Structure formats: structure tokens, C-alpha cells
A protein has these predicted regions:
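Basic, Lys/Arg-enriched alpha-helical interface segments
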Residues: 1-68, 74-94
Length: 94
């Protein structure tokens, strides 16, 4: 089992004008990540899981809808997934 750790900003980002479909997909994404880890996320084509580059190198991204993304980092030696941001497709750092 993988541990999911959310950044403190994520609650604030999700409490705004986020569609309920995106919230449901985010919860399902967390369930899959908790059980199967990054390999399980990559196996599901609907998430379009991919590695990021540039200043986000070392992070990964999964789609929660056409516009919404979850950006996360994997710490493999402790089976930890750190969720950095849930955003409306804006990869710039806050």
C-alpha cells in the first residue's frame, strides 16, 4: 500500500469552483494510487499519466478531466506519493 500525502494548498484548491466530476475522479485517483501506486496510474489510459520536464522535473501529472490535472511526486523508497497541486492545467509554480 502506498501512502498519499497532500500539500496543504490542495484543500484550498479543491474547495473553490471545482466541478463535482473532477472531485470524484480525484478521489478515485487517490484510491488507485494508494492500492497500485504509480504503475497502476500509468496502466489506466484515461489518466494520461506522464512525467513533467523543466522546472517540474521529477514530478508526474495525471488528467482528472479535459482541463484539470493532479501534479504529484513519487518517493519510491518509502512508498509515498506527495500530491503537490490540483490545477486547471496551469503548470506554473504558485
Amino acid at each position: 500500500m502506498w501512502e498519499i500525502e497532500e500539500h496543504r494548498r490542495v484543500d484550498k484548491q479543491l474547495s473553490g469552483a471545482v466541478p463535482t466530476e473532477v472531485l470524484k475522479r480525484y478521489e478515485k485517483w487517490k484510491d488507485i494510487a494508494r492500492v497500485s501506486g504509480p504503475l497502476g496510474l500509468r496502466a489506466i489510459k484515461g489518466f494520461h499519466d506522464e512525467a513533467l520536464s523543466g522546472e517540474r522535473k521529477g514530478h508526474r501529472c495525471s488528467r482528472l478531466g479535459l482541463q484539470w490535472r493532479v501534479i504529484y511526486r513519487v518517493v519510491a523508497n518509502v512508498l509515498l506519493i506527495q500530491i503537490v497541486q490540483v490545477t486547471a492545467h496551469d503548470y506554473r509554480r504558485p
